A protein has these predicted regions:
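N-terminal glycine-/serine-/threonine-rich beta1-alpha1-beta2 phosphate-ribose binding loop
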Residues: 2-139, 151-163, 471
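Structural recognition of the beta-strand scaffold that forms the well-ordered cores
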Residues: 46-50, 71-75, 115-116, 138-139, ...
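Short, solvent-exposed loop/turn and secondary-structure capping segments
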Residues: 58-62, 83-87, 124-129, 149-150, ...
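A contiguous active-site-proximal alpha/beta segment in oxidoreductase catalytic domains
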Residues: 136-138, 144-221, 226
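Short, solvent-exposed turn/loop segments enriched in Gly/Ser/Thr/Pro and often Arg
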Residues: 78, 117-122, 143-145, 150, ...
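Extracytoplasmic/secreted proteins, especially bacterial periplasmic and envelope-associated proteins
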Residues: 54, 58, 86, 99-102, ...
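Contiguous beta-strand/loop segments that form the cofactor/metal-binding neighborhood of enzyme cores
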Residues: 178, 190, 195-201, 205-417, ...
Length: 473
């Protein structure tokens, strides 16, 4: 398509158009005998990017750096705003859209994969429509806004046989391969306790609100109706957009949803933690029904799994809510590959995000993303130096892994089947923060047994009129 591309905006496609599109393209995946592979004629994966500014810009550059992706479409609800201009300049020939529904209507057959870097609450409808049409999906973390959305996304990955990767990039780096090798070799065994922490400043620190923000005029570049997607109706306010959505229970998932997937993801997968049977808000400082607390300590209690003992994972956020650390804890080193915060502070005086894992006879200190574990104290590390297993190098980074999975050459390391339960753990934590109450979760019935309102929050907010269909794909 030429640089004089048409931009579609505002008016949503008809329900008939939507359902016809899903029925026609979705049938391809149900008829396919196995996994759907991208079939780009030039050997590249034809990619549509949803969310092209802020974090989206970083994801696009990393995806394109693999040399495996061909950009066919760009979609952003605030197309032409300052934060979108660099990407627009990099790909002048790509089709442009403000509404992902129009993008699928007009270009669905040209798209192999969709990359979703929009705010947390709008991941779900884009990913569900893409998967229902047999498109592979790369979705930034966390996968969805609610426990139910995440459940449906896992089901869709399986139903439509697509490659689906969540964007916790460390899941393809050294920490991933080391953690797996050390568990397989019995170096990490019988873990009973994990401390995870993220104590940098966040957007909502210092905020005081008594309700929703007042109505402001919608900027001419922004399609507010499409930005809201399935979320409940809100009047526009600049305090909701460009990262500010992270502060609000209605739109974001707080420090836990933002960072948990980078800190305890490998522990969750390789220790097979699954879902907790109890979540206890030990500390909630500055509780609000609208924005995330100024600090929180949450205890997630996971039951025994076969021969593995129960595990208590304790999460700490808030600038002054520092975790108790073992005396041997070494000076942490922040992973240089972590993207800088778009707002807030990564103050070097504050404890960098990380974790401590207490296992049978050994204690492990770790950071975030791809940073590797170290055994503490150093004397024990020296004793074990010759007994540690070889750790394989990664065959691909997280973006290459996804695109190779689209082509049937690798499996997604953070597939929705793997990342989904991790995100559901965090979704339960967000409910505990929101209500400031202990949750008793029954993994068999997948319900919260002790609190009616909390149980209702598993489903999330009801979708706005006209957006119900994404829950039926």
């Amino acid at each position: 398509m030429s640089s004089k591309t048409r931009m579609y905006s505002s008016s949503s496609p008809s329900r008939r158009s939507f359902l016809t599109s899903v029925a026609t393209l979705g049938a391809v995946s149900t008829l396919a005998p196995g996994f759907l592979k991208a079939q780009a004629a030039n050997g590249l994966v034809n990619v549509a990017y949803c969310g092209i500014g802020n974090r989206g810009e970083q994801v696009i550059k990393s995806m394109q750096a693999t040399g495996l992706a061909n950009v066919v479409a760009l979609c952003d609800t605030d197309m032409g705003a300052p934060h979108t201009k660099e990407v627009l300049g990099l790909f002048p020939g790509a089709a442009r859209f403000q509404d992902f529904r129009r993008m699928f209507d007009k270009m669905g057959r040209r798209i192999d994969a969709v990359v979703v870097s929009t705010p947390d609450f709008s991941h779900f409808p884009i990913a569900m429509l893409a998967m229902s049409q047999g498109k592979h999906v790369y979705c930034e973390k966390p996968m969805g806004q609610s426990f139910r959305q995440i459940e449906l996304m896992m089901q869709a990955e399986h139903k439509y046989k697509v490659a689906a990767q969540m964007g916790n990039q460390g899941h393809s780096d050294a920490n991933y391969h080391q953690f797996k090798a050390w568990v397989d070799a019995g170096i990490i065994r019988n873990v009973t306790r994990i401390t995870a922490f993220m104590n940098n400043s966040r957007r909502w620190h210092g905020m005081k609100v008594s309700g929703r923000l007042p109505k402001q005029a919608v900027p001419p570049s922004l399609d507010w109706e499409s930005w809201l997607a399935t979320a409940a109706e809100h009047d526009y306010n600049v305090g909701y957009v460009n990262g500010e959505w992270r502060s609000w229970f209605d739109f974001g998932n707080g420090a836990l949803g933002d960072w948990g997937a980078h800190i305890f993801d490998t522990a969750h997968e390789f220790l097979e933690l699954g879902l907790p049977n109890e979540v206890v808000p030990v500390v909630i400082d500055g509780h609000s029904p609208y924005i995330f607390p100024q600090a929180s300590t949450l205890a997630f209690r996971f039951p025994a799994r076969g021969s593995r003992p129960p595990v208590e994972l304790t999460w700490y956020d808030g600038q002054r809510n520092l975790p108790p650390l073992p005396p041997e804890f070494a000076a942490p080193v922040a992973d240089p590959n972590i993207p800088p915060p778009s707002r807030g502070s990564a103050d070097a005086k504050v404890l960098p995000p990380g974790k401590v894992i207490y296992a049978d006879g050994l204690t492990f200190q770790g950071g975030t993303h791809g940073s590797t574990l170290k055994i503490i104290p150093e004397s024990k590390a020296l004793d074990l130096a010759g007994k540690l297993p070889m750790v394989p190098s990664s065959t691909s980074n997280h973006f290459e892994n996804f695109l190779l999975a689209c082509q049937g050459e690798e499996r997604c390391r953070s597939s929705f089947a793997v990342a989904g339960p991790l995100c559901q753990v965090m979704a339960l934590g967000v409910i505990a923060q929101r209500l400031n109450t202990t949750l008793a979760f029954d993994s068999t019935t997948r319900k919260i047994a002790n609190h009616k309102v909390a149980n209702e929050l598993l489903a999330g907010a009801p979708p706005r009129k006209g957006w119900e269909q994404y829950y039926k794909l």
